[in-house]
Amino acid sequence: PKLNISCLMSVSHVILPSVIKEFKTYHPNILIEIYEGVGGFISDAVIDGQVDFGIGSSEFYPKAVSVVDEVEEKFVAVMPKRHNLAKLSAITLQNIGHLPLVSMPPSSGIRQLIDAEALKIGLILNHEITTNQYNTMFNFILAGLGVSIVPVSVVRELDKSQFCVKTIEPVINRKLAVLIRSNQILGDASKQFLKLLLPNLKNIS
């Protein structure tokens, strides 16, 4: 037996290791394959039947997909410890608007949501460097190449002696959800996995 899961990269490396470890203590013989991606990839994999369920953004998903459970996660700004903005207690999009950003690809839900929030106040953000890996993003930040706006979960393991993490005001949240095909009946393995996953997902912020 095998469990196939599509998952946002920003969630997979933070939440899934401990959940999978616990799941395997109960189901050691079930194989698990994780399909990591951004944006519409998660729901596409669900619709195509490539995976049993997806963990992705519920801001943008097609009608062929249903939401099992939903949580909110806030965004934060990440910069080098000695950055000029590090002395501020909180960061606004106006503070960041003129700065070079290190960002996820345009296809990512994160990028789309941030751009939409900026446009509401008449800002077009300067996405000077694009990468699809957080480790690469953080290395670029340390090199002084820019600032990033990321979900708070991805900064849990950052070395706070090198990085400064600041709250963004007004708060920007994204909605995360477990996604399944509409009218899909979950199998026992999926149900057991979600039973372990959902409490962790709710604590993501």
Spans of features found by a protein language model:
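Hydrophobic hinge/microswitch elements
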Residues: 38-51, 56-57, 107-164
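Short, well-ordered beta-strand segments
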Residues: 2-6, 54, 78, 102, ...
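Alpha-helical segments flanking ligand/cofactor-binding loops in enzyme cores
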Residues: 43-44, 68, 94, 138-139, ...
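Beta-alpha-beta core module
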Residues: 62-69, 73-74, 88-89, 135-183
